[in-house]
Amino acid sequence: VLHFIVGKRLAAGRLTVVDATNVQAESRAQLVRLAREHDVLPVAIVLDVPEHVCAERNAARADRAGLPRRVIQRHQRELRRSLGTLEREGFRTVHVLRGAREVEDVEVVRERRFNDLRHLTGPFDVVGDVHGCRAELETLLDRLGYALVRDAEGRAADAVHPEGRTAVFVGDLVDRGPDSPGVLRLVMGMVASGRALCVSGNHENKLGRHLDGRTVQHTHGLAETVEQLAKEDEAFRAGVATFIKGLVSHYVLDGGALVVCHAGLPEKYHGRTSGRVRSFALYGDTTGETDEFGLPVRYPWAEEYRGRAAVVYGHTPTPRAGWLNNTLCLDTGCTFGGKLTALRWPERELVDVPAERVWYEPTKPLAAEAPGGADGRP
C-alpha cells in the first residue's frame, strides 16, 4: 500500500515524505526505484539518535512498548552501516541529523527544483538555435528592442531591454557559425546580469565535454568552435566551461504555461529531473531508423502532444517556425542560410532576421514545410 500511495503522489507531482525505519538497503531500494520511475530526485534525512533515546521513545508508544531492546540495537548497527552508502544507492542529497537536539531544532526548507521558474512571468523573448551566428543574434536582439552593451574592445557583452523583458535561449549557441565565442560572450553576459536564461543544447553538452578534457568527435561544427576558442584567453575558456556546466535541461516558466527546452519535451517530463528527462530535452527521441541522408529519423512527439503548457524548442531545423499542438520549433536554420527566429511571449508573436549568408552546408535540405498553420499560430 505504501509504495502504491507514493507512486500516485509522485505521478501527480506532489511533495512525498516517507516516514519509515528504512535501515535496510533493500527497503530503500524500492523507494529509489519509484523516484527514478517518476523522474524525481530522492533525498534522505537520517535521524541518528542515541540508542537510549530510541528505547525511551519506543517505550512511550503503546504500539511499540514491547519491542525488544535487541531490535533497536540491530537498527542502530544497520543505520551506521548505511551512512556511507546512501549516495551510491541513488539518493541525490543526504542530510544526517545527529542527536535528539539536532532533530528537534532542525528547520526543513523546501527548495525549488532548478528547472522550476514558474514564479517568473516574463515577458520573454525566446530565441532559437544561434549556432555561432553572432551578427544575426545582435540584429535580432536589436529588432526585439534590446540595447547592446559593449565591452572595452567593442564586443557585445550584454543586452538590456527598456521594458525589462527577459531573453530565453533554447541552446545550441555554438558550432557551425563564424563566431561562437562572440555568441557565448553575449549570452553569458546576459545570463550573468539576470537579463537572460539559457538551457543546454546538445552542442553545448559536447563542447562542455571537450573543455572538460574528455574525448569527443570534432564533427558537426565542433572543430570550428574549438579553433575559434583557441584564440580566446584561458579565463574566457574557463568561464565557458563553467557556464555550460550550469545549464539545465529545461525551464518551466510563467506559472507553468511555458516550457523552454532544446529538443522538445512531453508533458510527463515537465519539471522532472533525471538523466532520461535531460536526454530527451537535449536530443529528442528517434524511431531507430535513418533517412536517406544517414541521419536519425526523429520521433514525432509534437504530433501527440496535448499538454497545457506551450513547449518552445529548437534542435531540428525548419524553414519557418509554426505551431503544432501548442508546441513551436524555433530552429529556422540560420547557420544554413535560413533565419534566426524569436518568439515574443506571452504575445505569441514571431520575429526573425535573415542569415547574412550560408555559413555551413546542411547535410540535407531544410524540410519543405514547417509545422502549424501559415500564420505561424496554433
What are these regions (language model features)?
Residues 1-43:
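Conserved nucleotide-sensing/catalytic segment adjacent to the nucleotide-binding pocket
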Residues 12-14, 38-43, 90-93, 165, ...:
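Short glycine-/polar-rich loops that comprise or flank the Walker A/P-loop
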Residues 49-110:
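Conserved GTP-binding G-domain of TRAFAC-class P-loop NTPases and closely related GTPase folds
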Residues 65, 70-73, 162-164, 176-253, ...:
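Active-site neighborhood of divalent metal-dependent phosphoester bond hydrolases
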Residues 104-184:
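N-terminal active-site segment of His-dependent metallophosphoesterases
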Residues 129, 172, 187, 201-202, ...:
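Divalent metal-coordination and catalytic microenvironments
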Residues 132-135, 175-178, 204-208, 267-268, ...:
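Active-site environment of divalent metal-dependent phosphoester hydrolases
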Residues 279, 283-378:
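Acidic, His/Gly-rich catalytic cores of divalent-metal-dependent hydrolytic chemistry
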